[in-house]
Amino acid sequence: MTQYLQDTVEAIAIDLVNPGICHFVWKACDDVVFEHIRSSDFIAFINLHKKAPIPIIKDRRAGKMCHVLYELSLCHSIPGLTNQWIEHMLVALGIDNETYQHHHLIKPNSLGTSKSNKKFAERIQEAIKLADIINL
C-alpha cells in the first residue's frame, strides 16, 4: 500500500466503501468466490483496516473477484484513491494486473458473457442496489 493511501485512510478515519455495501457483496461471494470469512473481516479488508485477514480466493475464481473489486471501486467514498486501492487489493490477493484488465468488467447483457458470469454480475449489482435501498 502506498504511504499516501495509508495516510489518507488513517487521517480521515472513514471507510472507503460503505460497510453495508461490503456486507451485501460479502453475502453474494462468501464461500463462492473466496473461502469463508466473517463479514466483519471482509469489510475490514476492503476498507484497508490494519491486520484484516486477506480472503483466500477459490480456484478459478480470480476473474470474479476482479469484478467484485471493480464494482466496489465504483462505490468509493474518495474516488481519487480508487486506482491505488485497486492496485493494493490486487497485490494483497495475488492477482496480476493483466487478469484484472481481462476480467473486471462483466457485462450481464453482452452476448459473449457466459450464463454463470451474467448471473454472478447480476447478483453483485443487486447486492449493491439492495444496500443502497436500505441505505446502510
Predicted regions and their residues:
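Flexible coil/loop and intrinsically disordered linker positions at secondary-structure junctions
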Residues: 1-136
